[in-house]
């Protein structure tokens, strides 16, 4: 089994076993986070990066879109994912990036200047 298939299988298991609509922390922009499936994107990204695979942002965007539908790839969702990913690859802690994205990113294009 190649690494790509293994990753896809692992992500599917993680996403299917995750309680859909998991509670989000108080103060988060929960409607957009739920709609964009940012929680699931986060889990996928962490799994992908732990396996040191390439192109994790693109891989996880594709996986989430396939599982939850094309609405998860709308413009506002792309902004959430981009801000979270930028923070994480800058070496910030995962918890810091999650809290920051969840509490301050609204999905507006202006968010990209500050995330």
Curated annotation (Swiss-Prot):
Keywords: Calcium channel impairing toxin, Disulfide bond, Ion channel impairing toxin, Metal-binding, Secreted, Signal, Toxin, Voltage-gated calcium channel impairing toxin. Disulfide bonds join 36-77, 44-60, 48-56, 83-115, 87-97. Residues 22-26 form a propeptide. The keyword Zinc-finger does not apply. Residues 1-21 form the signal peptide. Zn(2+) binds at residues 40, 68. It is found in: Secreted. One of its GO terms (molecular function) is calcium channel regulator activity. It comes from the Eukaryota. One of its GO terms (cellular component) is extracellular region. The keyword Disulfide bond applies. Negative results: does not modulate desensitization of the ionotropic glutamate receptor AMPA GRIA2, despite its high degree of structural similarity to Conus striatus con-ikot-ikot (AC P0CB20) which blocks desensitization of these receptor types. Shows no inhibition on Cav1.2/CACNA1A, Nav1.4/SCN4A, Nav1.7/SCN9A, Kv11.1/KCNH2, Kv1.2/KCNA2, Kv1.3/KCNA3, Kv4.3/KCND3 channels. Shows very weak inhibition (IC(50)>30 uM) on Cav2.1/CACNA1A, Cav2.2/CACNA1B, Cav3.1/CACNA1G, Cav3.2/CACNA1H, Cav3.3/CACNA1I, Kv1.1/KCNA1, and Kv1.2/KCNA2. Does not modulate all recombinant GPCRs tested (more than 50). The cysteine framework is VIII (C-C-C-C-C-C-C-C-C-C). Mostly found as a homodimer in solution; non-covalently bound. This is Macroconotoxin Mu8.1. It comes from Conus mucronatus (Pointed cone).
């Amino acid at each position: 089994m190649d690494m790509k298939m293994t990753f896809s299988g692992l992500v599917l298991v993680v996403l299917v076993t995750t309680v859909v609509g998991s509670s989000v922390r108080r103060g988060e922009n929960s409607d957009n986070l739920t709609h964009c499936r940012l929680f699931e994107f986060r889990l996928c990204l962490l799994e992908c990066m732990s396996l040191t695979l390439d192109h994790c942002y693109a891989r996880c965007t594709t996986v989430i879109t396939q599982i939850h539908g094309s609405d998860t790839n709308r413009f506002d969702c792309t902004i959430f994912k981009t801000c979270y990913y930028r923070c994480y690859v800058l070496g910030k802690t995962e918890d810091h990036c999650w809290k920051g994205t969840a509490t301050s990113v609204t999905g507006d294009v202006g968010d990209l200047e500050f995330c």
